[in-house]
Amino acid sequence: MKRIDLHIHTVASDGMETPEQIVSHAREEGLAAIAITDHDTVDGFQAAYNAAQGTGLEVVPGIELGTAYKGTLHILGYYIDLENRELKQELQGIVEDRDIRNEKTVALMQKNGLQLRYEDMKVRFGSVVGKPHFAEILVEFGFAEDIQDAISRFLQKGRKYWIPRKTLAPERCIELILNAGGIPVIAHPFEYKYENKSLAELIEFCMAHGLKGLECRHSNHSPGQMAYLQLLADEYGLVKTGGSDYHGSFKPDIRLGTGRGLVNVPYSWLEELKKLRK
């Protein structure tokens, strides 16, 4: 079976590998296609696409937009036009908000005796500074044992260095993806702790605004949950997608292509996704 992975993060957001490393890794894993779905940015796609030329590996343009619906919600977008002006303007606003939040985080850390500057972090980590980078700093200063420990103790919602972010409404996320010629998909539906009834309400709400798909296979979902999501996708006439949600060493127990061993997304799902392209 030809396998694919439609949920991957690079250093353009909170992943720990470059787009070129992702392509090399995907080829080692024998994948037929991957999607670069960085958080709130499309900056990682072109380098991955270029690296894959002549290798036979398909690279799908994608994004993962953060929003909220009775709590956190993520919307994936596939086959978006990366040059869409409306999308680019909205993403620029998200970048500006992230910089403001990062500067506030640095200021909080400075008050607690950490000697660092945001400018130095951008030199070290690149223009996209995120949660794993702050976690790495906390580990280096001896405040945490590892990155996951730092995030759970200091950077999660309600913790010492957490700064709330501005979020787009879910209907706006879907609209942006559709207007950019893309296919909107609810990411990892069971991560939001919905009961079955609430999940159905979420799907119906998003479908009313143009939702086209459901991520049915994900590293954090059990076999039973993944089977149920496939039934829901069929019931609602939604396209199925799936992926590992790979972040590299940021999430060391998740492997590209298979997640924790159970993801295994068939190429036929990508073929169905392609049918929805504008």
Language-model segments: residues:
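An N-terminally biased module of ancient metal coordination in phosphate/nucleic-acid-related enzymes
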Residues: 1-72, 155-156, 168, 172-251
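Extended substrate/RNA-proximal surfaces in nucleic-acid metabolism proteins
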Residues: 51-204, 261-276
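Short, Lys/Arg-enriched, disordered terminal segments
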Residues: 1-2, 275-278
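C-terminal active-site subregion of NodB/CE4 polysaccharide deacetylases
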Residues: 237-243, 248-274
